[in-house]
C-alpha cells in the first residue's frame, strides 16, 4: 500500500501566515523582513508537516488554487437580496481583505513565487481555472478504484468531505471541544473495516492493518506525542450528501452563495435564511431525519426534493415564492457547491487529465524527498521585491423544478 499526503495549498499558505500573527506577533507582509519571514515560514511548514506525517506516507501532492471556473458562471441574484449586495462568487471576501492590515497583494505574489519554486522539488498541481478543492476531488476520483493507493488530505474545509472514499480520508486541522487536536474524516466503510470487523474476519485474520490506522489516528501535528481520538471525538464519518444538500439549500457565506429562501423580520432590521434546523423541521413533517442516507435519497429523487422545498416554503413562512425561482437558484448552488467532475468545464478537465498523465509515474513510483527543502531559497521573479468521480453523483441535470 502506497500512501500519499495531498495538501490544500491555499489553506496551507493561510495557515502559515496565521502562524506569524499568533499572540502578540504581527506580520502584515509590508516590510522586507516580514516578506522574508513569510517565505521562510512556508518552507518550514512543509518540513514540519512532512515530519508529522513521515511515518505514515510515501509521497506528497500539493494542490493550489489558480483562478476558478466558478467565476465564469453567471451569478444568481436571489429575489430577497438588495441591489447593493455583492453577488459574485467569493466577492464578499474582497472588502474584508481590503480592510485588513495584511497586504494581500503581497501575500498572493509571495505565495505564487513559493509555488513556482517548489514545482522543481515535488508534485504540484497548479491549473488555471481550477481551485484546490477541484484538484483534490479529481485526483481522488482518478485513484478511486486503486486498492494500492491511499490518500490523506490535509485541509480544514468541511466541503472536502465530498472527496472521502474507502481509499481517501481527510485530516482536518481544526480545533474544537471534541477535536482539540484536529480530526480525521473517514468513510463509513473504512470505519467498519478498522473498528467493526465481523467474526469471520477476526477469526481468519483481516487484510487491513488496523494497527497502522490506530497509530495514524493518534498522531499529533506538533511533536512526537500521541493524542487520543475516538469516533465523534477526533474521528468523524464523512457525510458528503448531507454537506451538499445543506450548503446548496442554506447557502455558503464564505463563498457568497445564498440561501434559496430569505426573508426580513417584521421590523425589517434583521435578515433570515434557511438553517439546518428549518430543514430538520421540514423533514420531521414527513417523518424523516436529517441523516446522510435521507440526504442522498433527496438529492437523487426529484419528487422527494420537490416535496422538501414545498415544505420548507411553509416552515419558513414563504408560501408565495414560485418553485421555478427556487429551482433555478438551487441548480446554481449545486453547480457551485458539488465537487463533481461533471460540473467542471471540459477545457479544464482536459488540462487536468494532461497534467495528471505527466505526473502519474511519479505519483506511483517516487518517494518524497524532504532534503531538497532544507536551506531552500524561493526564486523571486520581481526584482523590486526580490525576497524571498466520483465523490457524489452529478445531480444538477435532474433538479428541474420548472
Where are these regions (language model features)?
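Conserved SAM-binding loop
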Residues: 153
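Non-catalytic nucleic-acid-binding/docking modules located in mid-to-C-terminal regions
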Residues: 48-66, 83-102, 120-124, 165, ...
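Noncatalytic, basic helical substrate-engagement surface that gates or grips nucleic-acid strands
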Residues: 2-150, 160, 164-186, 338-339, ...
